[in-house]
Amino acid sequence: MFPLSLLQPSHSPLCPCSQPALTLFGQLEDKNLGDNDLERRMQSVNEVCQLLFQDMDISRIRDQIRQPGAPESEGTSPNTGKDGKDPGNSL
């Protein structure tokens, strides 16, 4: 390990640093870790957004495939006669 004197702040007039070097490196490391964490979170959010948009596109395409047949037969089913009654259910 490091000698205790290296870990304590230096008050020597020869040292140009106003803060101990370990404190500065610690702050830099914390900032880098924070930036990496933020970047990782942003990547996760972007992946979720892409999946949601893909799901929305698939749902929209599925709805478009189902809809074209519906407007042609509005209000009538293929089993109804000219009067709108189902011939199989007449008594």
UniProtKB/Swiss-Prot annotation:
Residues 62-91 are annotated as: Disordered. Keywords: Stress response. Residues 82-91 have a biased composition (Basic and acidic residues). Belongs to the small heat shock protein (HSP20) family. This is Heat shock protein 30E. The gene is hsp30e.
